[in-house]
Amino acid sequence: MGRSSKKGPYIDPKLKKKIDELNRTGERRVIRTWARDCTIFPEMVGHTIAVHDGRRHVPIYITEQMVGHKLGEFAPTRTYRGHGKDAERTTRRR
């Protein structure tokens, strides 16, 4: 179930403060965050945010199409390596 519409989108206060500071100075640098549940808001467009995937930070360049989505949607936590392949047989067939 999604978040109640009367509450509005969740925005991490620390991340919002960093974005506002970068927009004010006009600086462009990578921001590291663990806030995967933060909603992408219009002020973030054009910035690169490194979102933690549980192991490392994945850099994500924010575009207009991403506004309204969550940061965690763009940093997958699981790596799919495919289903089991036929392993070489280790025993000798008779």
Swiss-Prot record:
Organism: Thermomicrobium roseum (strain ATCC 27502 / DSM 5159 / P-2)
Protein name from the UniProt record: Small ribosomal subunit protein uS19
Annotated region (Disordered), positions in chain: 73-94
Role description: Protein S19 forms a complex with S13 that binds strongly to the 16S ribosomal RNA.
SUPFAM superfamilies (UniProt xref): Ribosomal protein S19
Origin: domain of life: Bacteria
Cellular component per GO, a single term: cytoplasm
Biased composition (Basic and acidic residues): 83-94
Family, per entry: Belongs to the universal ribosomal protein uS19 family.
